UniProtKB/Swiss-Prot annotation:
Its EC number is 4.2.1.19. It comes from Bacillus mycoides (strain KBAB4) (Bacillus weihenstephanensis). One of its GO terms (cellular component) is cytoplasm. This is Imidazoleglycerol-phosphate dehydratase. Keywords: Amino-acid biosynthesis, Cytoplasm, Histidine biosynthesis, Lyase. Belongs to the imidazoleglycerol-phosphate dehydratase family. It holds the Pfam family IGPD. GO terms for molecular function: imidazoleglycerol-phosphate dehydratase activity.
Amino acid sequence: MRESSQVRETTETKIKLSLQLDESTNVSVQTGVGFFDHMLTLFARHGRFGLQIEAEGDVFVDAHHTVEDVGIVLGTCLKESLQNKEGINRYGSAYVPMDESLGFVAIDISGRSYIVFQGELTNPKLGDFDTELTEEFFRAVAHAANITLHARILYGSNTHHKIEALFKAFGRALREAVDKNANINGVNSTKGML
């Protein structure tokens, strides 16, 4: 099974995270940031991943350190669980509607970290979650996993719906990218490595 578990402890946060790429029944997320828990649960459910997160952070300051560090650890687990990347599709993309909003995510498991994030989040806060942290989370995942990630909110009026569409699209796009493909021998690259 392709899986990884990591613990990251700093003076600001303590993150314990396990990711299973090939098992989707065990999802448990507790970060201390309610809206973020909801988004991570949606990501795992729509990507069909197993995901367990226990996080403690300095949320009395704000949620920034917790959100960013969860992204770092998730990206690290993703990178480790993919091992040599043989036989995977490598690329994945998904459009996901959430009522009036439409989100799009495209992923390349390239070994090169890069992110493009486009979208207007008009409501600055949802519960205890600063909406600008959405981009910070995706940036942390992309850099830690060494993937290229494009995340775009095409349109919408409800900030919750916009972010939810992105997290669901992220799950679906990542599922497509990590899935094994019987037609791919070795690594899906003319270089012979990723």
